[in-house]
Amino acid sequence: HASCFAIPTAAVNTYFCYLKQMDDAEGGKGGTLLQEACDMLKTIALQAWTQPLRHDETDENVVSISRFRNHVWWVGGNALAYRSLLPVAAMYRSIPMIDLLAEVCQRGISMTSQTTYSDAFWTEGFTADGAGWGHGKQCLIWGYPIDGTSNALKMLNMLKGSPWAKNLGRDNVQALLNFLRGGAWYYYKGYRLPCLDRGSYVYNPTELSIPYAGMLDNLIGNWMDSFTPEEQRELLQLQQEVKKNRITMETYAP
């Protein structure tokens, strides 16, 4: 985790904290020590894209769609949530990296299932029954699926107004709605049902919002034009019920 998440993030953050000095170093200005520091920060930050090794052909070309598919370390939350991918792409001024991230973010907002496992873009994340997988086919509804999709949406938010702007397609919308609807079945009056993620057996007597509350707010705040008027009404009703920790959605329940 340190080699691909924490240390590269620290390196890229340090780089941008001293951006003027880094620009000088890359422009051939400054002393040898500054240039070496800049090179080292860029080398370490790139580990967000290179580590851990997959021991396949993608290790030779990390800026590839196949790098972000069919491996537990490179899909869902482990792909997009904990790695400083976009900052590193900006650090390297890499158009191919940003091209790739825009595509991965959009295609990652999708569903998988037992029957589509080999063909789905990601082998984990949202599942067709409205639940979710993480670290393979483990039932981790409230962790990796939300983390991966939330950060995909956040990156797409940042790319709005740029040449890399993407709209949510109907497949994206259907995957999101399916998860919002399905996830509500695993939550009751402020409490997550047991056996659904890594922390669901921890005793907590306090009511908490459903874990996808932040993602729902993001959709309503930034992506409402991707939904039909009827879907927008459904999302707004869900948001009101989420705020009360009482999700019934009686108008929409089967």
Model-predicted regions and their roles:
Residues 2-20, 26-254:
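Extracellular polysaccharide-recognition and catalytic grooves
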